[in-house]
């Protein structure tokens, strides 16, 4: 991965540029300076900026980062029953449990990045762990994608995610209070669940 504070020239890449047709463009070069793409063209005419690292991709694909717009970093994708979720949260809502959840979310975020996903929009995670992981990534403690974190979601009684990655709001006033609390905790977006569990 190119460092954000130096220049990198990728050569001999097969570029997928993100355009509508996105036809593979073989034997291309891309210059990145301080994290910004500044030039793209045929490898034969590429000129490396002074001090740039040159990475020969031998025909490997190079493309813009992907964006995953719906992620529960805590989950494996397998269903969890509401009863199991409540029992699990009681076991995890302590310093050791919160550290375990943050570790799981960190691993999931890093797996997203390793898969080419450079931006993740969270869809609700337990114990505000996504906000903690986002803050650690932003502080440079470890690598990860740009994380747009909602904290926990807000759901209706008996709603999706209740007790695991969503707080139950029993009234509009309670929902408004939860939104204010999420904002105060650093949520980037608010995730609402309005369907049943």
Regions found by a protein language model. Name each.
Residues 2-3, 15, 19-63:
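Histidine-rich, glycine-flanked metal-binding segment
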Residues 13, 30, 35, 59, ...:
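Divalent metal-coordination and catalytic microenvironments
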Residues 5-11:
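Extreme N-terminal starter segment of soluble prokaryotic enzymes
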């Amino acid at each position: 991965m190119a460092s954000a504070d130096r220049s990198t020239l990728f050569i001999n890449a097969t570029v997928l540029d993100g355009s509508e047709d996105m036809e593979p463009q073989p034997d291309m070069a891309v210059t990145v300076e301080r994290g910004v793409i500044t030039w793209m063209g045929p490898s034969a005419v590429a000129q490396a900026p002074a001090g740039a690292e040159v990475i020969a991709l031998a025909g490997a694909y190079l493309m813009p980062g992907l964006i995953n717009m719906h992620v529960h970093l805590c989950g494996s994708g397998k269903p969890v029953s509401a009863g199991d979720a409540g029992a699990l949260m009681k076991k995890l809502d302590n310093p050791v449990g919160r550290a375990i959840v943050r570790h799981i979310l960190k691993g999931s975020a890093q797996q997203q990045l390793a898969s080419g996903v450079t931006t993740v929009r969270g869809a609700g995670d337990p114990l505000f762990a996504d906000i903690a992981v986002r803050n650690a990534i932003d502080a440079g403690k470890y690598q990860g994608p740009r994380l747009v974190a909602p904290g926990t979601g807000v759901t209706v009684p008996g709603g999706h995610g209740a007790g695991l990655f969503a707080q139950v709001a029993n009234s509009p006033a309670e929902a408004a209070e939860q939104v204010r609390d999420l904002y105060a905790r650093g949520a980037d977006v608010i995730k609402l669940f309005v369907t049943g569990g």
